Every structure is written in C-alpha cells, then in structure tokens.
Amino acid sequence: MTQIILSEKIEAEKRTDWRSMWIAIVMQFVVGVQISVYYMSMWPYLSGVSFIDNMESKKFQTFQLDKTADFDFLGWVVASCSIGCTIANPIYGYWNQKTMSVKWPVITGFLIAAVGQLWYALLGFFGNVKWFMLCARFLTGLGVGNIAALRVYAAMASTPKDRMRAISFGTGGFVLGFSFGPVISSIFTPLGEEGIQFGGFILNMYTIVSYLMVLICLSACLVVYLFFKESYAGIVTKEEKEKDEVEVPMFDIPASLICIYLFMIVNMTATNIEVMSSPLTTVLYDWKDSDSIFYNGIALAISSAISVAFNIAQGSTRIGRIDKRKQMLFGLTFFLLYQLFMYPW
C-alpha cells in the first residue's frame, strides 16, 4: 500500500491533535444523523400527518399532508438530500483547500442544514407540501456537504502512523450517525401524530425531531467555534520536501475511483434499507406508522452497533493491518448476501 513516508526526525516532531480530531469525528456523526433521521418517518409524515386546518381556531386534523404525493415522489425527496450533498461537497472541499480552514466551512454547512431542518418542521403551514419537503431536504443536503471538509481534516491533521485510526473512527462516526438517525425518530413515537399543541405550532413524533435537529446543528456550530483548533500534522511543507525527509507517492487514480464506487454501493444499500423498511413492514405486518418507525428503529440500532464495533476494531486492533482488498471483499460479500436474502424468490 502506498503511503507518505516520513524520516524519523519529522515523525518524532509531528503529533496528531486528538482533541480536535475527536470533535471532527463527532461532527461526522452529526452529519450522518442529519442525512438519515427522516428515512423511516418521511413517508408517514407526508402521507398522513397532523397539521393546522384552521389558523384562527388553531385546530389540528390528521389527514394526508399532500394528496398528490405518491411513493415514486418519495424517491426524489430522499435523493434530493444526496443531490444537495453532491453539489456542496466539491464547494466545501475547494473552500477548505484555498483557505486551509475547516472551521468556517463546517459552521456554514451546519447553519444551512439548520434552516433546512426548520423548514421541514414547518411543512404543515405550506401548500404543495411535497415540493417544499423536497426543497427542505435539498437545502439540508447543501449544508451537510461540509462532511467533505471534515473528512479532509482527518487526513490532513493526522500523522501517517495515526491516519488509519483517525479515518476509521471518522467513518465509524458517520456510519453510527447514518444508522442511528432513524433510531432518534423512533424514540419520539410515543408522542403520536396528534402530539402537543403550542400556539400555532405542534410537537408530534415528526416535527419534534426536526426541531431537535435544528438545536443539534446550532450546538455543533457553537462547539466547533469555541473548542475546535485546527492542527495539520499530516501536511508536508515545502521545506520538508526540499530536504528529502518525506517521500510522497503518486496519486493512484484507479484505486481512488474504485474506492468511490464501493462507497457509493455502501450508501445505496444503506439508504435502500432505511427508506424501504418503514413502508414495507407497514404493508407486510399491518403495523401502524408509529409501530413501524419504533421497531425498525430497534433493528437499525442493533445494526449501527455492529457497524461501529467493526470500525473501532479496524482502527484499534490488528484487523486494520489486514490487506485492504481482503477487507473490502469481506464487506462486499455481506452486501451481496443481503441482496440474495431480500430478493422475492
């Protein structure tokens, strides 16, 4: 495996700032949560939810939020967040590269995501709700595209010795957040669709999660601004290159493209599981929306625990030293088995 090779002198001088690294890992967890938190509750929220029927009496009724919404459109709503993230990723990456700053791209992203989450919470006040939901999720995607800066920081702020651990834990944070997001929705199912009324607003099992996401985004901005200190132990300076104390390998384009492709497979499979689980189990087992969100949340909690355990093992044990190709083939085998078991034979 090609990697940056440092002289003993340079390696002794450089240290990974693990305090800032752990903050970056937690921020990746927050990004994962922001992306997936509605995956199981999105269709129930759109197809049948409590909202204001009469502004003067502030009377809430439960019926379809948007009668023109169908399951095909749900696919576009789910995709809109990923599309926004895809557009924003290179922008945040370019911003980070030009300014050598992670702090402000991350803060800006979370502020944009907070606006998107607040918009999602207030869908009941709008007409043409399905389009507003799509726009709200797209805006959230533009915000959480800041994960590009966070992932770059994991590489730039860690020494070659610590890089595997830093990237594994960062990936584990994102995977935990991505898997744990729907679990958060399931926690609030006891509120039901009617929820609690506060003036012109309603806190039910759908909207309270959105307000919580807004609070988490703003809290993340505060944490990054106050406690995050940028340290780039992994960057090779011009002086170090000139002294021949560092050996930097050529960029391996084919390997990078393969890794990007595999990452797409992982995310498509995970998204498929989380989005389809709620409507599928509702039909198969005749569950109520709240039951579907709750029980699928339990299943995903177990799944996320297993995923994080593997990421921790990869960064902390000898498993991380196993040939990377063998590790990828091992993981892909389970994705293939999932497709075989889920196929309607």
Model-found features: residue ranges?
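Glycine-rich segments within core transmembrane alpha-helices of 12-TM secondary carriers
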Residues: 85, 144, 162-193, 213-217, ...
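Transmembrane alpha-helices of Major Facilitator/SLC transporters
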Residues: 83-89, 272, 295-321, 331-344
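Hydrophobic core of transmembrane alpha-helices in multi-pass small-molecule transporters
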Residues: 29, 116, 128-145, 264, ...
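C-terminal ends and interior cores of transmembrane alpha-helices
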Residues: 108-127, 333-345
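Short amphipathic helix-loop junctions that connect adjacent transmembrane helices
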Residues: 40-72, 275-295
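Juxtamembrane intracellular "pre-TM" segments in multi-pass secondary transporters
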Residues: 2-21, 225, 229-261, 283-287
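Cytoplasmic helix-loop-helix junction between adjacent transmembrane helices
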Residues: 134-173
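Pair of pore-lining "gating" transmembrane helices in MFS-fold secondary transporters
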Residues: 11-54, 252-277
